[in-house]
Swiss-Prot record:
Role played: In elementary bodies (EBs, the infectious stage, which is able to survive outside the host cell) provides the structural integrity of the outer envelope through disulfide cross-links with the small cysteine-rich protein and the large cysteine-rich periplasmic protein. It has been described in publications as the Sarkosyl-insoluble COMC (Chlamydia outer membrane complex), and serves as the functional equivalent of peptidoglycan.
Gene that this sequence comes from: ompA
Gene Ontology cellular component list: cell outer membrane; pore complex
Top-level taxon of origin: Bacteria
Induction and repression of expression: In infected human monocytes transcripts are present by day 1 post-infection and have disappeared by day 3. In patients with confirmed synovial Chlamydia infections, 0/8 had detectable transcripts. In infected human Hep-2 cells, transcripts are visible from 5-48 hours post-infection.
Pfam families: Chlam_OMP
An example Gene Ontology molecular-function term: structural molecule activity
Keyword set includes Transport: yes
Signal peptide: 1-22
Oligomer status and interactors: Part of a disulfide cross-linked outer membrane complex (COMC) composed of the major outer membrane porin (MOMP), the small cysteine-rich protein (OmcA) and the large cysteine-rich periplasmic protein (OmcB).
Protein name: Major outer membrane porin, serovar D
Family: Belongs to the chlamydial porin (CP) (TC 1.B.2) family.
């Protein structure tokens, strides 16, 4: 049985190192791996010993914490209906732009994100009790990247308006939704923190069964937003938008004269519980674990308008192409720009974990019972790699 357990754990550790595929699980034996310190000798006494003191029971560890999520499995968390203009039904020619909101099927409902990445570098500090329990925290910086179908971001615009673009009515609302395009965003590097606890619950020889609980939080701002759409392609650096505002947006939306906007930021929260099993083989302690986690990315459903000129140049305020090729720049003529997209905007919808359960495999290398380096990979609910290097005082 011991040989089988060793084989399984060693295979898992080697597999993780060869295929680096949020929050790490960590080695369940970590509280008891480093039993000696670089400044003070470790204490191997019995917690029930009446002569033992808290000074004997407590120790500190510090080190580096690196967590790199290459693909988090996320989906949108939105309502089934979305308020916008009625869907166009005119066979030919233009029509008056809609001015009333209609409940339509939300194209963002249940959408899966194509890519979600997050990279964190931090310092970690752990308070150890009786070489069995850890209470730890991390303080550092994180940055992220999100990519998805334009429908996931409710990219909409007005099409077929019979008015000249210079005189779009203030009450006009979008009537077209885009689902054949891509939206991606990059966040800045911002402060991130996490707290957690880990305990070695059961030990038998070289095997250790442990559990942990962690919580992490960060709020990065959106550094760059790219909309890759044939009908309305644009890029915004440090985008701003409207929070809690229904259509129609102000006619100044997307211009430098816009008011009532705020910076686009994403409020990231995640908590995780895990259970793992390890087996010590001299310097190496491979482990395998399962985890259950929930992550959310909330941008307050901020709506961001396409950038445009505050005043018309050649009777246009954007460089959106014509759809039917019938557009013409002609002052005062009705419908001449009816086949170009008007008042284009998108919103950053709330996202959450699409899968809650995952597995983690890794190994820890311990030197002189004072220093340790852990390498881990996580699969199923995310593809991620984790590196942790620490020493005990």
């Amino acid at each position: 049985m011991k040989k089988l357990l060793k084989s399984v754990l060693v295979f898992a550790a080697l597999s993780s190192a060869s295929s680096l595929q949020a929050l790490p699980v960590g080695n369940p034996a970590e509280p008891s791996l480093m039993i000696d310190g670089i400044l003070w000798e470790g204490f191997g006494g019995d917690p029930c010993d009446p002569c033992a003191t808290w000074c004997d029971a407590i120790s500190m560890r510090v080190g580096y914490y690196g967590d790199f999520v290459f693909d988090r499995v996320l989906k949108t968390d939105v309502n089934k209906e979305f308020q916008m203009g009625a869907k166009p039904t005119t066979d030919t020619g233009n029509s008056a732009a809609p001015s009333t909101l209609t409940a339509r099927e939300n194209p963002a409902y249940g959408r899966h994100m194509q890519d979600a990445e997050m990279f964190t570098n931090a310092a970690c500090m752990a308070l150890n009790i009786w070489d069995r329990f850890d209470v730890f925290c991390t303080l550092g910086a994180t940055s992220g990247y999100l990519k998805g179908n334009s429908a996931s971001f409710n990219l909409v615009g007005l099409f077929g308006d019979n008015e000249n673009q210079k005189t779009v009515k203030a009450e006009s609302v979008p009537n077209m939704s885009f689902d054949q395009s891509v939206v991606e965003l990059y966040t800045d590097t911002t402060f991130a923190w996490s707290v957690g606890a880990r305990a070695a619950l059961w030990e038998c020889g070289c095997a250790t069964l442990g559990a942990s609980f962690q919580y992490a939080q960060s709020k990065p701002k959106v550094e760059e937003l790219n909309v890759l759409c044939n009908a309305a392609e644009f890029t915004i650096n440090k985008p701003k938008g409207y929070v809690g505002k229904e259509f129609p947006l102000d006619l100044t939306a997307g211009t430098d004269a816009a008011t009532g906007t705020k910076d686009a930021s994403i409020d990231y929260h995640e908590w995780q519980a895990s259970l793992a099993l390890s087996y010590r083989l001299n310097m190496f302690t491979p482990y395998i674990g399962v985890k259950w986690s929930r992550a959310s990315f909330d941008a307050d459903t901020i709506r961001i308008a396409q950038p445009k000129s505050a005043t018309a140049i050649f009777d246009t305020t954007t460089l959106n192409p014509t759809i039917a090729g019938a557009g013409d720049v002609k002052t005062g003529a009705e419908g001449q720009l009816g086949d170009t997209m008007q008042i284009v905007s998108l919103q950053l919808n709330k996202m959450k974990s699409r899968k809650s359960c995952g597995i983690a495999v890794g190994t820890t290398i311990v030197d002189a019972d004072k220093y340790a380096v852990t390498v881990e990979t996580r699969l199923i609910d995310e593809r991620a790699a984790h590196v942790n290097a620490q020493f005990r005082f």
